[in-house]
Design a protein with these regions (language model features):
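Leucine-rich repeat
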Residues: 2-4, 23-26, 44-47, 85-88, ...
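Conserved hydrophobic beta-strand positions in leucine-rich repeat
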Residues: 6-10, 18, 27-31, 50-52, ...
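Sensor of tandemly repeated, compositionally biased sequence architecture
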Residues: 25, 37, 46, 57, ...
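Consensus "Asn ladder" position of solenoid repeat domains
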Residues: 13, 34, 55, 75, ...
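Canonical leucine-rich repeat
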Residues: 8, 18, 39-41, 60-61, ...
């Protein structure tokens, strides 16, 4: 692999697959606006920023990238593996079809945007550095952000499924 590569921007290229295994020095990866259905960045312990938002392909107008009202999309990324990404600080994965998100090894996160996915359960309790959480338009039934002392911004709107919200002990909110 490209063992010394530190930054890769491959956004808006109509990519259907992306293999970054072996890119162990990678610190920033931008792959938004492609047609990926899975992304594996596991073990990239130097990765600080990952942006892979909006990888949905327009189905009713194949090959088109410009968005029109009424377009029909696939789910975009439905499999995301970020295990071992212990340096990750910024994670932007909005507008995909991600059903679950394991953040247990991403304890350095300060910014998380996972809005407009299919996430039904989200554990952020270990994210003590988190300042911004955008998780709107998901399938969460409960959200507990209590005790996240650095959390300044929380966006959790447009979730009819949400019946429980705990924002206690968040002095920065």
């Amino acid at each position: 692999g490209m063992t010394s590569l530190k930054e890769l921007d491959c956004s808006h290229l109509s990519l259907r697959s992306l293999n970054v295994s072996g890119c162990t020095a990678l610190e920033k990866l931008y792959s938004s606006g492609n047609w990926l259905d899975r992304l594996d960045v596991s073990g990239l312990s130097n990765l600080r920023e990952l942006s892979c938002s909006d990888n949905r392909e327009i189905l009713n107008r194949p090959g088109k990238v410009a968005r029109d009202p009424g377009d029909v999309y696939d789910d975009g990324i439905t499999e995301l593996n970020i295990s071992g990404c212990t340096s990750l600080e910024i994670l932007t994965i909005n507008d995909n079809g991600i059903p679950a998100l394991d953040l247990s090894q991403c304890t350095s996160l300060t910014y998380l945007d996972c809005s407009n996915n299919d996430i039904a359960s989200l554990n952020v309790s270990m994210l003590s550095e988190l300042e911004t959480l955008r998780c709107d338009e998901n399938k969460l039934t409960s959200l507990q952000v209590s005790g996240l002392s650095k959390l300044k911004a929380l966006n959790c709107q447009y979730m009819k499924s949400l019946s429980s919200l705990d924002i206690s002990n968040c002095p920065a909110l």
